[in-house]
Amino acid sequence: MIVVDTNVIASMWVPNDLDEWVYKVLKKDDDWVSPLLWRSEFRNVLSIYLRKDILEFSVVLQATEEAEQLMDANEFEVNSTQVMSFVLDSSCSAYDCEFVALADDLDVPLVTFDKKILREFPNIAIHPKEFAL
């Protein structure tokens, strides 16, 4: 089991050069979990691609459905005190700290491309390339 953040999830459905590593992560460990927040962040990511006419509406809807199926029953609530504790100890947003808190709570790695999270939480976060090797 691993915690994945929204950028990792989104990399499977939006145009990018990172999807190769995401699929390697999925092959190594397909038990992905995230805080419930991932859904809202994912919709926001897709909205950017939709508004810039990079993805069509039908593709966005399909991506949403597929991502929700992937993460079905793998979504967790997180403890606000724990999240705010990580906020206090870092310069990361509360959104980012939700993923950190979940990984810490489950005692599993957080797989992320986010450089700030990787830098500020090196004992919890790991880059997909590192995890996949």
Region locations from a protein language model:
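Non-catalytic, surface-exposed connector residues within folded enzymatic/regulatory domains
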Residues: 36, 54-61, 77, 97, ...
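Active-site-proximal, substrate-binding regions of enzyme catalytic domains
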Residues: 43-72, 80, 86
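Active-site neighborhoods of divalent-metal-dependent phosphate/nucleic-acid chemistry enzymes
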Residues: 72-113
